[in-house]
């Protein structure tokens, strides 16, 4: 059995990392309205951004790291994911990134981040940190007041009570509530998923990996990914080998998720690894850099690997975020605010709000969200959620950024073109128009919200007169912030939500007449079920390990009623049909 080329089935049902470079969201947002400063709570211009499927927080980290290059601004990030494990990883990543330097040094934080974020297996020391941090977060989730006191940058208030309970259960599982490696045998799960994905080509998996890397990722701009690190990740799931490979043997429980499978004619819940096994975590931070010396070549070969560039970029991000938070922590308008009490904690200059999982089509019903956001980001796996209802939450003149499928190795050029065309159709139906003044990009599609303002830029208030240079942020056409070296910002794209992992493409270039129809090219989306830890005792009794479901992985095929997000975006009908979920 071999999956046809272009099927897009290598990316799983849950996305754990971004598949395109990180964005500075300030560079993507419209100019600041100077009149809005007096309307905000802190008398400081605010950026309200809604992110669908950002997955790993890379856009927010990049935005905070480059905030010192822009005029003072406060950030309100509203994040919507399609599973609570992704929400939990967001919380873990930011709690690590914002850890006090006295408790954990910069290098240790960056190395711990890389392993938790991109490695299927961990070192024992990192696994111990994960257990301790997960236990701490599990105790904070049920206590909103204590959570806001200790983590003032985080808000879980929009989440439903049952979602908070399930989120707590996820952290309990991470902290070792269920003992033993057999609870989540990552190495076996990775190998079984790889066997099912490659099928008859499993014995030639190294050749398949080389083909995908050299003929696809390298051709699409990711030349710095070295074949040794790509092969190692495809074989073992370890992307960043910061120590000897033998040191990595503890399963990374943050990559565990659940789904419904068919077992002897019944639907049962199973825990497994349903993430990406095709592209890898190298694209998010590893193929672009502000320091161009990292990208230089010698004799036609890059002098640095994607792993080395990723480690450098993450370290610089953490250093810049720490430097920005220190002197520029917002306590309100300094001229009008009384001196704070000695014991009062400084207010964070940003807040991350996590929204309910199914709220994309109901946000516009709340007046606090209607017309609020200056920027909307949508990953390619969430494009099916872009609708006129969601567009109503964007202010006139606000910007929309949609990631494209450039780094999805299962997709052929004609499928990539069809996806890009479909994105334009969906965005226009939602009330957006393409930006014509920006440089064309194969990674992101950029739009602006139609309204009272003209194409010239942003809100009508911005166009009514000249804006003081101290407040006006650069226009979207000049994407880079005002700095001397004009270093381009990293761009990011979040991975699509894909289902089962049928095989990769054949070793030889596919024939034109072998291309599957567009409806079959993208990976299907998994059944969304609550975290296994949050189930009732009766439900928990039917939870089976993945290996117990059936022989080899015959029953791992997605149920026929599940619809893929990317497949839905490529459907030829003009209407966006809602996803059908298995109950």
From Swiss-Prot:
Required for the assembly of axonemal inner and outer dynein arms. Involved in preassembly of dyneins into complexes before their transport into cilia. Keywords: Cilium biogenesis/degradation, Cytoplasm. Residues 455-534 are annotated as: Disordered. This is Dynein axonemal assembly factor 3. It holds the Pfam family DUF4471. It comes from Rattus norvegicus. It is found in: Cytoplasm; Dynein axonemal particle. GO terms for biological process: axonemal dynein complex assembly; determination of left/right symmetry; heart development; motile cilium assembly. The gene is Dnaaf3. One of its GO terms (cellular component) is dynein axonemal particle. It comes from the Eukaryota. Belongs to the DNAAF3 family.
């Amino acid at each position: 059995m071999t999956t046809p080329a272009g099927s897009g089935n290598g990316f799983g049902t849950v996305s754990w990392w971004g598949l395109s470079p990180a964005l500075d969201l300030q560079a993507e947002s419209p100019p600041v309205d100077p009149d809005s400063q007096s309307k905000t709570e802190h008398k400081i211009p605010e950026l309200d951004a809604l992110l669908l499927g950002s997955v790993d927080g890379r856009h927010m980290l990049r935005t905070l790291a480059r905030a010192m290059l822009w005029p003072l601004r406060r950030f309100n990030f509203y994040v919507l994911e399609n599973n609570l494990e992704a929400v939990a990883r967001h919380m873990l990543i930011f709690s690590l990134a914002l850890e006090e330097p006295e408790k954990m040094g910069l290098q240790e934080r960056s190395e711990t981040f890389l392993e938790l974020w991109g490695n299927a297996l961990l070192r024992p020391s990192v696994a111990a940190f994960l257990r301790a941090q997960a236990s701490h977060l599990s105790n904070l989730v049920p206590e909103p007041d204590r959570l806001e006191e200790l983590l003032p940058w985080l808000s879980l208030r929009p989440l439903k009570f049952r979602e908070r309970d399930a989120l707590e259960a996820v952290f309990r599982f991470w902290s070792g509530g269920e003992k033993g490696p057999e609870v989540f045998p990552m190495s076996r799960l990775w190998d079984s998923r790889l066997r099912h994905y490659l099928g008859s080509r499993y014995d030639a998996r190294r050749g398949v990996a080389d083909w995908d890397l050299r003929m696809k990722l390298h051709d699409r701009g990711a030349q710095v990914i070295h074949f040794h690190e790509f092969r190692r990740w495809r074989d073992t799931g370890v992307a960043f080998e910061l120590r000897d490979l033998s040191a990595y043997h503890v399963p990374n429980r943050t990559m565990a998720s659940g789904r419904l499978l068919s077992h002897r004619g019944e639907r049962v819940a199973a825990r497994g690894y349903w993430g990406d096994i095709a592209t890898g975590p190298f694209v998010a931070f590893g193929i672009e850099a502000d320091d161009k010396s990292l990208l230089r070549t010698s004799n036609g070969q890059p002098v640095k690997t994607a792993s080395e560039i990723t480690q450098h970029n993450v370290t610089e991000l953490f250093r810049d975020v720490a430097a920005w938070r220190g002197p520029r922590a917002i306590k309100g308008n300094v001229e009008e605010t009384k001196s704070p009490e000695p014991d009062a904690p400084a207010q964070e200059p940003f807040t991350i709000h996590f929204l309910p999982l199914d709220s994309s089509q109901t946000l516009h019903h709340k007046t606090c969200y209607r017309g609020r956001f200056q920027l909307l980001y949508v990953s390619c796996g969430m494009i099916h959620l872009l609708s006129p209802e969601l567009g109503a939450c964007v202010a006139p003149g606000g910007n929309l950024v949609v990631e494209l499928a450039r780094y999805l190795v299962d997709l052929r050029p004609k499928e990539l073109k069809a996806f890009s065309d479909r994105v334009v159709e969906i965005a226009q139906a939602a009330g957006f128009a393409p930006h014509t003044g920006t440089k064309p990009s194969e990674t992101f599609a950029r739009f602006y919200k139609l309204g009272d303002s003209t194409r010239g830029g942003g809100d009508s208030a911005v166009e009514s007169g000249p804006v003081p240079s101290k407040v006006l942020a650069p226009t979207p056409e000049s994407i880079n912030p005002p700095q001397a070296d004009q270093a381009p910002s990293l761009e990011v794209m979040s991975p699509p939500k894909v289902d089962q992992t049928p095989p990769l493409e054949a070793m030889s270039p596919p024939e034109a007449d072998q291309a599957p129809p567009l409806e079959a090219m993208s990976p299907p989306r998994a059944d969304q079920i609550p975290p296994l830890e949050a189930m009732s005792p009766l439900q928990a009794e039917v939870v089976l390990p993945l290996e117990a479901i059936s022989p080899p992985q015959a029953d791992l095929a997605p149920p026929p009623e599940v619809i893929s997000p990317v497949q839905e975006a490529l459907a030829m009908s003009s209407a966006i049909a809602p996803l059908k979920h298995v109950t």
